[in-house]
Curated annotation (Swiss-Prot):
Name the record gives this protein: Disks large homolog 4
Effect of substituting residue 3 to S: Loss of palmitoylation and targeting to postsynaptic density
Residues with Phosphotyrosine modification: 240, 580, 715
Expression (tissue specificity): Expressed in brain (at protein level). Detected in juxtaparanodal zones in the central nervous system and at nerve terminal plexuses of basket cells in the cerebellum. Expressed in cerebrum. Expressed in hippocampal neurons (at protein level). Isoform 1 and isoform 2: highly expressed in cerebellum, cortex, hippocampus, and corpus striatum.
List of residues that carry Phosphothreonine: 420
PTM summary: Palmitoylated. Palmitoylation is required for targeting to postsynaptic density, plasma membrane and synapses. Palmitoylation by ZDHHC2 occurs when the synaptic activity decreases and induces DLG4 synaptic clustering. Palmitoylation by ZDHHC15 regulates trafficking to the postsynaptic density and function in synaptogenesis. Palmitoylation may play a role in glutamate receptor GRIA1 synapse clustering. Depalmitoylated by ABHD17A and ABHD17B and to a lesser extent by ABHD17C, ABHD12, ABHD13, LYPLA1 and LYPLA2.
């Protein structure tokens, strides 16, 4: 009887609870986080007498320096190998065995499965134990330089294919694109299905696994999936495809990433890795044996696929990303449809749901005629294990998308001055707003390719606000406008959806709304002005004191502090105007406070203390940013005094995040700091110039400095009197 020998390999995943704290990094490194590939001279990498090996072969090698910025989930890849446990044969190299979807490495796009790590920053890991390599990566800091080696891929055969559209269109399906990689680490667009009887099938040259480089004159390298689909759809009857044919060595598994080893099982690696990066401990193995394992959403938009049309029962376990899909619909009984599936999320990994599915029920709750709000509540309150009855209805979903498309066309026509009877006349054309929330177009429906994503604090020039749901806008950088133009959700749309969310939250809580009146923030109107002073700095949230101290000590020529006022008697060693402005009359200081000459004041031991507007102005007019340790209320008082501050809120992601950033405080102190920060954000969000987050103080401090640099002026955006 044959024996089956299973060999396991050590692994380490750089994310979630295993993510180490970020260490100090050289000041110049953050600017290199997105640097282009650098081919490293092999002489600098090879020690005398050391023979480099990759996968036990002597193939032609290439070298690359890759700089990654550690994200919320760490570096986003898995490794195996080492002198104590070689991954392939007797090769002691440290190999990349998995690229985590959505992680830092996947977003950068250059690191590949089977790359061999030679150096981590300046640490040589070519011939070390597995634990030593893990330690080198843990101690590498927030900005990590990897020197990697890989075998050069065989040259692809590029050819041009002419297709003539038939009744089934072009007759093939695609997958891939930026943010939706079909093969981890590769943004290319791949052919995943040839429709029998279609144009591609009749021509015979296009094959599964082919890479589409261009459609007519439109390049498809490093584009989003939606853009590739649009390029293929927006063609006439005759279409020219520029196609790269893969090497024969890889044709055995067109869906798998090129694997140049014979002893490494991609299937095994996926099977033992999935549960750990989802942050779950479900006993059910999620073995991704389907060829769709690298394709989060079914992308059969160019031809019909044989997909069961009967209702299906799907069980999904809620993960750290929720259920991992978005829904649309719920108006006029049109049904609830899945519009987006998050790559790497529970729905994606189950392989059971697809865009275009109608959700018929959730845990027995009938959603066939539910409103969008009712469906959202049912999904939110479904618990950890969710049973969904879904039915694939591409025709109905296509009609829903067609309605969105018609709206988009109307908006476009309106913006060009043609107008339509269904759109209101446009009372507001050409105004500027500042976003008070983050918007990710991929999480919304309908406008995936033409919507404009933005972050909190971004300034947008609204070109056309004639529609109630979508405004046409252009992003503004500094004192110039970019070519980034698209559609953003209107104030009404944002507030309606947020109220629905808050209503669902209150409905699902045991205490109900308790009379709470949550304010919904969307945008504020802004106007541009020129300033001739250094803007004061107000940092709020956990670690603000450390950030203030570091700015003053690191850049004494750029930052300063003002001298406070007090009615306390002067002590012998104190100097008036240096330590304090000593006010002899309490009555006078009280009058000045009532006259709004102080941005903040209080009483301690029967003496008044305060920071005057004039003290801040003196520092600002000296060309130094005045660092202020005040409350958020001071922001509005400074604005009223025409000293527009840069207010930066340091937002903790969680209680654990507070403890990780400041290891010297107790859990109780961290909980109080987290609660204070949460309340501060709820009450003063509109006062913040920017919101920063980070896994370490070093990361936060770097972002704080970048915000100050970006918002220093001389041209700045300030709140306008006009209300939306």
């Amino acid at each position: 009887m044959d024996c089956l020998c299973i060999v396991t390999t050590k692994k380490y995943r750089y994310q979630d609870e295993d993510t180490p704290p970020l260490e100090h990094s050289p000041a110049h490194l953050p600017n290199q986080a997105n640097s282009p590939p650098v081919i490293v001279n092999t002489d600098t990498l090879e020690a005398p007498g050391y023979e480099l090996q990759v996968n036990g072969t002597e193939g032609e090698m290439e070298y690359e320096e890759i700089t990654l910025e550690r994200g919320n989930s760490g570096l986003g890849f898995s490794i195996a190998g080492g002198t104590d446990n070689p991954h392939i044969g007797d090769d002691p190299s440290i190999f990349i065995t998995k690229i985590i979807p959505g992680g830092a490495a996947a977003q950068d796009g250059r690191l590949r499965v089977n790359d061999s790590i030679l150096f981590v920053n300046e640490v040589d890991v070519r011939e070390v134990t597995h634990s030593a390599a893990v330690e080198a990566l843990k101690e590498a800091g927030s900005i990590v330089r990897l020197y990697v080696m890989r075998r050069k891929p065989p040259a692809e055969k590029v050819m041009e294919i002419k297709l003539i559209k038939g009744p089934k269109g072009l007759g093939f399906s695609i997958a891939g694109g930026v943010g939706n990689q079909h093969i981890p680490g590769d943004n290319s667009i791949y052919v995943t299905k040839i429709i029998e009887g279609g144009a591609a099938h009749k021509d015979g040259r296009l094959q599964i696994g082919d890479k589409i480089l261009a459609v007519n004159s439109v390049g498809l390298e490093d584009v989003m999936h939606e853009d590739a689909v649009a390029a293929l759809k927006n063609t006439y009857d005759v279409v020219y495809l520029k196609v790269a044919k893969p090497s024969n060595a890889y044709l055995s598994d067109s869906y798998a990433p090129p694997d140049i080893t014979t002893s490494y099982s991609q299937h095994l690696d996926n099977e033992i890795s999935h549960s750990s990066y989802l942050g779950t401990d479900y006993p059910t193995a999620m073995t991704p044996t389907s060829p769709r394992r690298y394709s989060p959403v079914a992308k059969d938009l160019l031809g019909e696929e044989d997909i069961p049309r009967e209702p299906r029962r799907i069980v999904i376990h809620r993960g750290s990303t929720g259920l991992g899909f978005n829904i649309v619909g719920g108006e006029d009984g049109e049904g609830i449809f899945i519009s987006f599936i998050l790559a790497g999320g529970p729905a994606d990994l189950s392989g059971e749901l697809r865009k275009g599915d109608q959700i018929l029920s959730v845990n027995g709750v009938d959603l066939r005629n539910a409103s969008h709000e009712q469906a959202a509540i049912a999904l939110k309150n479904a618990g950890q294990t969710v049973t969904i009855i879904a039915q694939y209805k591409p025709e109905e979903y296509s009609r829903f998308e067609a309605k969105i498309h018609d709206l988009r066309e109307q908006l476009m026509n309106s913006s060009l001055g043609s107008g339509t009877a269904s759109l209101r006349s446009n009372p507001k054309r050409g105004f500027y707003i500042r976003a008070l929330f983050d918007y990710d177009k991929t999480k919304d429906c309908g406008f995936l390719s033409q919507a404009l994503s933005f972050r909190f604090g971004d300034v947008l020039h609204v070109i056309d606000a004639g529609d109630e749901e979508w405004w046409q806008a252009r992003r503004v950088h500094s004192d110039s406008e970019t070519d980034d133009i698209g559609f953003i959700p209107s104030k009404r749309r944002v507030e309606r959806r947020e109220w629905s969310r808050l209503k669902a939250k209150d409905w699902g809580s045991s205490s109900g709304s308790q009379g709470r009146e949550d304010s919904v923030l969307s945008y504020e109107t802004v106007t541009q002005m020129e300033v001739h002073y250094a803007r004061p700095i107000i940092i709020l949230g956990p670690t603000k004191d450390r950030a203030n101290d570091d700015l003053l000590s690191e850049f004494p020529d750029k930052f300063g502090s003002c001298v406070p006022h007090t009615t306390r008697p002067k002590r012998e060693y104190e100097i008036d105007g240096r330590d304090y402005h000593f006010v002899s009359s309490r009555e006078k200081m009280e009058k000045d406070i009532q006259a709004h000459k102080f941005i903040e004041a209080g009483q301690y031991n029967s003496h008044l203390y305060g920071t005057s507007v004039q003290s801040v102005r003196e520092v600002a007019e000296q060309g130094k940013h005045c660092i202020l340790d005040v409350s958020a209320n001071a922001v509005r008082r400074l604005q009223a005094a025409h000293l527009h501050p840069i207010a930066i809120f340091i937002r903790p992601r969680s209680l654990e995040n507070v403890l990780e950033i400041n290891k010297r405080i107790t859990e109780e102190q961290a909980r109080k700091a987290f609660d204070r920060a949460t309340k501060l954000e709820q009450e003063f969000t509109e006062c913040f110039s920017a919101i920063v987050e980070g896994d370490s103080f070093e990361e936060i401090y770097h972002k704080v400095k970048r915000v100050i640099e970006d918002l220093s002026g001389p041209y700045i955006w300030v709140p306008a009197r006009e209300r939306l």
